[in-house]
UniProtKB/Swiss-Prot annotation:
Keyword Ribosomal protein: yes
Self-association state and partner proteins as the record states: Part of the 30S ribosomal subunit. Contacts proteins S3 and S10.
This protein's name: Small ribosomal subunit protein uS14
GO molecular function, one term: rRNA binding
GO BP, one annotated term: translation
Length: 101
């Protein structure tokens, strides 16, 4: 099990990201707009840098929904490899079974 504080910190980051997602996208699209003057674009970069760091998507860590484990994460199931192995072995995940050849 991951530390509860790590999981909560990650949840807080993801909520902040979702809250400021549109604002961040709008600023980035204006920054890359070549029709604006260099000075205007520079001011937009300053506005973007004033947004909280945790509102960036790169600060969010994918974690297992069951255990909170950050490594060995499978996006399709939103679980770590250990839990997938347990659930697949007991037949809880439909359509997933251990391969054999």
């Amino acid at each position: 099990m991951a530390k509860v504080s790590s999981v909560q910190k990650n949840l807080k980051r993801s909520k902040l990201f979702n809250k400021l997602k549109l604002k961040r996208q709008a600023l980035k699209s204006k920054i890359y707009d070549k029709n604006l003057s260099l000075e205007e674009r520079f001011n937009l970069v300053l506005k973007l840098s004033k947004l909280p760091r945790n509102s960036s998507s790169t600060r969010i860590r994918n974690r297992c929904a069951e255990t909170g484990r950050p490594r060995g994460y499978y996006r399709k199931f939103k679980l770590c490899r250990n839990i997938i192995r347990e659930l697949a072995g007991s037949g809880i995940i439909p359509g997933l079974r251990k391969s054999s050849w």
